Amino acid sequence: MKTKQDPRDQKNYDSLQSNLFRLIPPTTHKISLARPNGFLRGLADLVGKYSVDGAEESLFQPGAWDAPYVQPAFFDFLVHAKTISKHEPVGVPLFCFKNNSTAPSIDVLFTPISFHAAVGLPADVDPNVHRVAHIWYGDDSEVSSLMEDLNILLEESNLHTRLHPVGILVENNDSSFLNRVTALTHGPAYMSRKQAALKLVIPTDLFVDLDARLNVEAYGAQPSGGTSTVFCTLVYTRCGNDIKPALTFFKSNKSDFDVLTLIRAYYADLITNKLEVNQQCNINGLKFGVMCTVGYTDSSHSINQQSLCIRGSSLLVTSISNFFVNYTGWRVFA
């Protein structure tokens, strides 16, 4: 006959077992206090018994411990050889032109210097860039034939609908037929492999420091903080009987609204001249220029100028360190 177990007996048994186990001393850990090496080794062994292997790797994504902590974004382009000169400095801005007839796998990239040569700007416009462009690319370079329907796009002031800013140059692998061009499209300016810092490099002829060039107080512009933004403008100017596009880069620590006012003041004479010359009132060609944001940097960092000597010619460039690439699309300012 099976006896019925009293719940109180089980409760008393559990209590007795718990009290009995409390009388047993805990397991001791041998840690030497006499020798520093022995203490550290014993402490490491003790912690290792209760830690999980690879916990650090499982909690953090790969590369989280490598500078920069905000990872930059890179993109590779395939371009025809000799359309991006091997002399182009690292850190120069890049622009991509979309051709309807170009193979999808082949890109059309321009730097400010190759763009100057491709659109055929005269020598009196940015003379130093003009001289270097013809030395690096030549008068019969392939860059002059890369943009189809250029004249039509310029007549209607619509080149910016096909020309898009993409980033800054990181690497240009030169070859006989195709070049692989690596661009930093967004993020802090670092090399993709060496994690070495990059600088934004702009030909000095194409660079304007708005805060130093114009009397900003006359326009009521106020500093926006400790960050300076670099902008790029593409304007449609009249050179004789032709319309030519020109790139210019501006730096300012003012707000976007104030920068828009300052850029309009900078181009005031050219804007007025285009409106006076456009006697036919062609609404498609009334646009004077567009602008975009290239990125930003700390206002406390100074701007450096240096001379690049290549093939017996020198080019004065402006370099901006500690730069964060943050391109935006074009927007019409006049």
Swiss-Prot record:
GO terms for biological process: viral capsid assembly. It is found in: Virion; Host nucleus. GO terms for molecular function: DNA binding. It comes from the Viruses. It holds the Pfam family Herpes_VP19C. The keyword Secreted does not apply. Keywords: Capsid protein, Host nucleus, Virion. GO terms for cellular component: host cell nucleus; viral capsid. Coiled coil: none annotated. Its main location: virion. The keyword DNA-binding does not apply. Belongs to the herpesviridae TRX1 protein family. Structural component of the T=16 icosahedral capsid. The capsid is composed of pentamers and hexamers of major capsid protein/MCP, which are linked together by heterotrimers called triplexes. These triplexes are formed by a single molecule of triplex protein 1/TRX1 and two copies of triplex protein 2/TRX2. Additionally, TRX1 is required for efficient transport of TRX2 to the nucleus, which is the site of capsid assembly. Interacts with TRX2, MCP and capsid vertex component 2/CVC2. This is Triplex capsid protein 1.
